[in-house]
Amino acid sequence: MLASLVALASCAHDDIGRAPRPVPSWLFYPREIWRLISPPPGEMPSPARPGGQVERFHPVDFAEPVRAVPPPQHPFMAANPGSNMHDDASMTDTAAAPGPLGIDPEIVTRSEGFGGYGTMAFDRKKRLVGVYGNGREFWVQLLDAHTLVKLASYSLPPRPWSFPLEGVAPWKYIGAGMYFYLDERDRAVVPTTENSIEVVQIPDDPASGIRSVRSYDLHEHVVKLDWPQRDSVAWVLPEWNGRRYWYATTSGMVGTVDVETGAIAELRLAGDAGPEIVENSFAVGEDGIFIASDRALYRFSAGANGEVVTDWRTPYDRGPAMKPGLISRGTGTSVSLVGGTDGLVVITDNAEPRIHVLFVRRSDGALGCSEPLFGDGQSATDVSAVELEHADRAGAPTGEFSAIVENNWSSGSFPVSNPEPGLTRVDAIREPDGGYRCKTVWTNPTRGINVAKASLGAGLLYTYFRDPADAVTQWYLSAVDLTSGETVYRVRAGAGQGFNNWAGSLFLHPDGGAFYTTTIFGMVMVRDAPAG
């Protein structure tokens, strides 16, 4: 396996305009190869065949569209749901368009060797914009969303050759543009390995190339660590009025950058127990910036000169230790917003024996309600929850909010994860007195470590993972009914480690009908066959 990784990582990156190489379908462990050569009696695994096979548990029309209040459109980010890893400034991981229904599915893949795409966004022409990385080198790429052909590429700063000494494995590294966003002018705003913010223009005509239009140097405004450790600017998002970029680093520095002047203000996160770190992306609302550290949830705003002002701080139960399968101790979810400025902030804690989903008031940081998740002693999450605000037939808010959380409590290590099963939907319901009550609506035994996505137009939640019951590793896109929690269908994407998406995110095309996911060897698209 290691030899295969090294060989494939050396693939060239000069394939602009060419048909993409497919994701390799032959990356199996020795025990799997033996099983393929000598299968037990009655067993005939055929993993090398192309994907697209459907296993259906309910009719195509089983799920119905879900009525929801759309998240607000940030005026300085690309159109929802195509601006960043979590689709919008509220980080809801939802889209209005209908997702694929499993009708004669087609599988399209691309690979450049070992490496993948942390985030995929969609420009005004609905082309894919992504940051591709192989653990050391990184590129902004423009891809055709239907063929996955590379149209243009821009090289970003690499990690230094000393990066293995930092102790952060490539599959745990969250810098270098993994969390870039696309702005309203089709510019990718990318935090780089040099602790800068690089603003690069995506061209209307790919022949003119991707080019840098502005850079902001933040290397003096991060936490200073002893060599070889390095702090990383991992997240950057625009303030609602567009005057400033807000950034956060993995070692707990939060700051603002004046878009015009480049002036920088910073604040090191710390509480009574000492310095805090950040391991998850943050959300932006009209009322402030919402960031979770490994100890507390914050709302920030900018002072008159850009200084970071703490509006409120809400501690949560970070648990006794980092749990199996997670990368840090503390909340594992990105911060998400539902409702308007009188709505809620959603995260999870890291409590034992069970974690809780927390619905926190945006206005003052007070806990609205919480609900325990999953089984005792095997309860954890390390990916963003999916959130939505329900609406009535007229489109008006009903005062009901949903969060869908995935269980990532896991044994194993890269590239094999063995998470405990569990997807759970919890609703927070606003009471007449303004309080909230939480209730568990459904639980589904699906396993996964991916960033799931909801299609409101199809009424489906989509996840991507392997089936532990398979004789050799096979990967599936599964669709779960948002209302009942029942699995509607699953489609086989492919087999072997080439199709392993290792905690990657799913992305729905803005027009619907097609889902994309990164893998550790590239990208996979699953779409319904075109009508007619």
Regions found by a protein language model. Give the residues of each.
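Residue-level detector of Asp-centered blade-edge/turn motifs that repeat once per structural unit
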Residues: D123-K125, L182-R185, E239-G242, V284-E286, ...
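Structural motif
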Residues: G135-A145, E194-D205, S251-D258, R295-S301, ...
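Blade-level signature of beta-propeller repeat domains, shared across WD40, Kelch, NHL, RCC1
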Residues: N500-G532
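Repeated scaffold domains used in trafficking and secretory/extracellular systems
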Residues: E112-F122, P160-Y181, V222-P238, G274-G285, ...
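Sequence/structural signature of beta-propeller modules
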Residues: A7-R159, R185-R187, A529-G532
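Surface-exposed loop and turn segments in beta-propeller and other repeat-based domains
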Residues: A97-I103, Y154-W171, V213-Q229, A270-P275, ...
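Asp-box/WD-like beta-propeller blade repeats and closely related beta-sheet repeat scaffolds
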Residues: P160-G177, E194-S196, I202-W240, T249-S251, ...
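Loop/turn-rich, solvent-exposed surfaces of beta-rich toroidal or solenoidal domains
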Residues: L344-I347, V386-Q497
